[in-house]
């Protein structure tokens, strides 16, 4: 029993782009300074996003409630104008599925259930706090206008 131990698990309150609280996240597993798994929670009706990760892919599994995952993938049209293509996926805890989202895909999370929604994410590579510019925030208006940051 000498190997049994408790470790702190950091919990962070999250906010939308206008500063309103929309849920929280908690680090589930860490490898040194890097977070290899975390749970993100969204209040009923709340939206989290949009953002993309330049180097990190996401792997989501919904373990409570129903979550709509809204994705925007960057593409080009003939005149050189950037166009983001929208795609939606629903993850439901009553029918567990994994959703893989590659790097450079803008992602929004919307709780479409009546209870708090929980998503577990296993990012690849693990979240590294030293990569300061790896996450890029977007608004829906910026994505629809073809903005690239």
What are these regions (language model features)?
Residues 107:
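Glycine-centered loop/turn positions within well-structured domains
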């Amino acid at each position: 029993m000498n190997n049994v131990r408790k470790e702190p698990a950091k919990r962070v309150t999250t906010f939308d782009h206008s500063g309103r609280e929309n849920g929280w996240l908690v680090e589930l597993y860490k490898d040194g300074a890097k977070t290899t798994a975390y749970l993100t929670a969204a209040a009923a009706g709340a939206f989290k996003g949009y953002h993309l990760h330049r180097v990190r892919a996401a792997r989501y599994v919904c373990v409570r409630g129903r979550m709509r995952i809204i994705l925007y993938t960057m593409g080009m049209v003939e005149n050189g104008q950037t166009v983001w293509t929208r795609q939606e996926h629903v993850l439901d805890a009553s029918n567990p599925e994994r959703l893989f989202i590659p790097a450079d895909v803008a992602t929004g999370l919307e709780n479409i259930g009546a209870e708090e929604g929980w998503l577990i994410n296993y990012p690849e590579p693990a979240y590294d706090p030293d990569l300061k510019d790896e996450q890029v925030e977007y608004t829906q208006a910026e994505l629809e206008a073809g903005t690239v940051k």
